[in-house]
Each structure stands twice: as C-alpha cells, then as structure tokens.
Amino acid sequence: MTILLLAGSPSAPSRSTRLLNHVGDKLVQLGHRYARLEVRDLPGQAILRADWNDAQIKAALSTVEEASAVVIATPVYKAAYSGILKAFLDLLPQFGLTDKLVLPLATGGSQSHMLALDYALRPVLSSLNPKHVLPSIYATEAQVTWSEESGLTLDAPIAARVEEGVAQLSASLSALHKAAPQEFREVPFSQVRCSI
C-alpha cells in the first residue's frame, strides 16, 4: 500500500513541507513506502486552467489515484490553506479520494489559524469521499523550527501529535489491508462439488 505525501506549499523551503517530510520518515520507520508530490512543481498554467491533458497533471492525478493514503501538508495563509493546494484539489475527480485515508497537516503563524484545517480544508477533503480523514495536526511557526545544525525541531506536544497521527494512519492502513478482498485462486475441476 502506497502513501502519498502531498506538499501544498507554494514556497521552498517550507515549514509545512519539512513537517510532511518528518511524517514520511516516521512512516518509513514503521515499514511503509511513500511517493512525494509537491504541487508547486507542477505547471502553474495547467493547474489554473484545469488542463487535464497536461502530462505532468495527468501523472500527478494518477499518483493520487494509486495511493491508499494521502498525507496533505499546507501552510495557512489568511485563515485558509494555500491557494495552489485548492487549485490542485479542484482537479481531482468528484470522488477523487474514495477509499483513501487522509491525514491533514498545517503550519501557521499563530494558534488563531488552528481551526482553518477543520473549517476550510476538512470539508473539501470530505467532499472527495475519503474512507476516513484522521484528526488534523496543526503547528505554529514557533513549534516547528529548522536550523542547519540541528535540522527539524518539534515542540514536545507537536512531536507527540505527529507520533499519534502516524500511528493512527499506520494502524488504519493495516486494518484496510486485512479487510481487502483476497484474490481468488483457481480450483481444479475435480475438487468442485455440485448438488442438484
């Protein structure tokens, strides 16, 4: 089962993308594989014009379709998730997240933007028909810091939320995998019994 790490930040480097990478590292430690997609690397004209014929857009949509779970990270600007992420989500089919697990992550300047995930992003994600949207993880700029010497540093409460979110995602993926229908195997005709 593949997990897609979807970075919705228009800039690089980005706190939200670094938080997303950290979640990816935690998932690898639990034995999961992931693919990465940075929306800012897609052609802007194609996204804004909803050009589904663009090769990069087709490949990106295919990556979303093939994933069992999507971890979406975005910065919060003016009490909403990034516009480039919204433009990309608008390209997905009506039920583009069907049967997928979704873990939303966001970073913002202050705690006052914390509800942006629940009031702005979650309804859009829910409209795409995911199997389950896990509890969101929001961190302020002060809670997610970066330096060349020490790399990414998370405040203890955020580190705990990330551990919990990754554990929930991993457990949910395992449950989905166990519940998935197994492939049928051929049965020799001599073993088939029919009654009339």
Predicted regions and their residues:
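Cofactor-binding loop segments of dinucleotide-utilizing enzymes, especially the Rossmann-like FAD-
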Residues: 8-10, 39, 107-108
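N-terminal beta-loop-helix "entrance" segment that forms/cooperates
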Residues: 36-55, 145-149
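Helix-loop-strand module that forms the ligand-binding subsite of alpha/beta enzymes
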Residues: 52, 56-129
